[in-house]
C-alpha cells in the first residue's frame, strides 16, 4: 500500500497575526511545486481561523497542537474536537512530549484524546518518544511500544484508527540540535510498524510514521531514505517558509 508522505509543521507558541500571514503567503506560493508530499501546519489555536481562510483552496492542510479529551463542559481553557472540526482541521497533534512532560499527560489521557479526535473525523498525530535517560538505559523500544499500546487498547475499533499518524520524537533531540541518526530512527519506526502489524496488517500498512527531532533541510533527505519513515514532524524549521518548503521538496523527491 502506498502511503502519502506527510511533512507537518508544529509552530508551537510562536507567531503573530502579521508573521503568520507572511508565512502563509510564502507557503502558498511555494507549495505548488510539491506533487507527492502533503504539507500540514499546526498553529496556536488563535490562528486557526487565519490558516483556514488562507489555505482552504490550497493543497496545504492544517490542524491543532492539542485537543481536549472531553466533548464539552466546564473545562476552562480546553478546546474540544468538535470545535476544531468547525475550523475544518484535518489533523491534531496529541501526546507531544512537551505536553507529557510539562503538563503531566499520561498515556491514558493521550489515548482518550485520540478517541475524541477520531469521533469528530479528525486524524490524530500520536507522538511517542523516550528521554535521554531512557535511551541510555536501553529502554527506547519498551517505552515507545507502551505509549502506542495504550492508544491501541483504548481505541480497539481498528476501523476507526484508519488515517491516524504516529510520530516518533526522541525527547533528547527536540530543540537541542541533536538528532537521531537515520538508522536509529529507522530502528524505532520498524518496531512501531511491527507493533501495528501484530494488531492488524492493513492498519500497519496504512499508518504513516513520521520522525520528529530537530529535522532540518540538512538532515531530512537521509531520514526520508529509510523505508519506514513516511515524513517528518518539524518544529523550528517550520517557522521559516524556505526551510519548511525545502524539507517538503526533499520528502517529495524521496517517494
Swiss-Prot record:
Annotated EC: 5.3.1.1
Metabolic or biological pathway: Carbohydrate biosynthesis; gluconeogenesis; Carbohydrate degradation; glycolysis; D-glyceraldehyde 3-phosphate from glycerone phosphate: step 1/1
Under the heading NCBIfam families, the entry gives: tim
- Protein name per Swiss-Prot or TrEMBL: Triosephosphate isomerase
The UniProt record lists the keyword Cytoplasm: yes
Tell me a GO cellular component: cytosol
- What is this protein's function? Involved in the gluconeogenesis. Catalyzes stereospecifically the conversion of dihydroxyacetone phosphate (DHAP) to D-glyceraldehyde-3-phosphate (G3P).
Enzyme active site: 96 (electrophile), 169 (proton acceptor)
CDD domains assigned to the protein according to its UniProt record, in alphabetical order = TIM
Provide the organism lineage as a comma list.
Bacteria, Pseudomonadati, Pseudomonadota, Gammaproteobacteria, Legionellales
Species this chain originates from = Coxiella burnetii (strain RSA 493 / Nine Mile phase I)
Q: Which family does it belong to?
A: Belongs to the triosephosphate isomerase family.
Q: Could you describe the subunit structure of this protein?
A: Homodimer.
Which UniProt keywords are listed? Cytoplasm, Gluconeogenesis, Glycolysis, Isomerase
Amino acid at each position: 500500500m502506498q502511503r502519502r508522505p506527510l511533512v507537518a509543521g508544529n509552530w508551537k507558541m510562536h507567531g503573530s497575526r502579521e508573521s503568520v500571514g507572511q508565512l502563509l503567503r510564502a507557503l502558498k506560493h511555494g507549495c505548488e511545486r510539491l506533487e507527492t508530499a502533503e504539507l500540514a501546519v499546526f498553529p496556536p489555536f488563535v490562528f486557526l481561523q487565519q490558516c483556514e481562510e488562507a489555505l482552504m483552496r490550497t493543497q496545504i492542510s492544517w490542524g491543532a497542537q492539542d485537543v481536549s479529551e472531553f466533548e464539552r463542559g466546564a473545562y476552562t481553557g480546553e478546546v474540544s474536537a468538535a470545535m476544531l472540526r468547525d475550523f475544518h482541521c484535518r489533523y491534531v497533534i496529541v501526546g507531544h512530549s512537551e505536553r507529557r512532560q510539562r503538563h503531566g499527560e499520561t498515556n491514558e489521557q493521550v489515548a482518550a484524546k485520540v478517541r475524541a479526535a477520531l469521533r469528530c473525523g479528525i486524524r490524530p498525530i500520536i507522538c511517542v518518544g523516550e528521554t535521554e535517560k531512557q535511551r541510555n538505559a536501553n529502554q527506547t523500544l519498551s517505552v515507545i511500544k507502551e505509549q502506542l499500546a495504550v492508544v491501541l487498547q483504548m481505541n480497539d475499533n481498528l476501523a476507526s484508527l484508519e488515517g491516524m499518524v504516529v510520530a516518533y520524537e526522541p525527547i533528547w533531540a527536540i530543540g537541542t540540535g541533536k538528532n537521531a541518526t537515520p538508522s536509529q530512527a529507522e530502528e524505532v519506526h520498524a518496531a512501531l510498524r511491527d507493533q501495528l502489524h501484530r494488531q492488524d496488517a492493513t492498519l500497519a500498512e496504512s499508518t504513516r510514521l513520521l520522525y520528529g527531532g530537530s529535522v532540518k533541510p540538512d538532515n531530512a533527505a537521509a531520514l526520508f531514505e529509510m523505508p519506514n519513515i513516511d515524513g517528518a514532524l518539524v518544529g523550528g524549521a517550520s517557522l521559516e517558509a524556505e526551510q519548511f518548503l525545502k524539507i517538503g521538496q526533499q520528502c517529495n523527491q524521496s517517494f
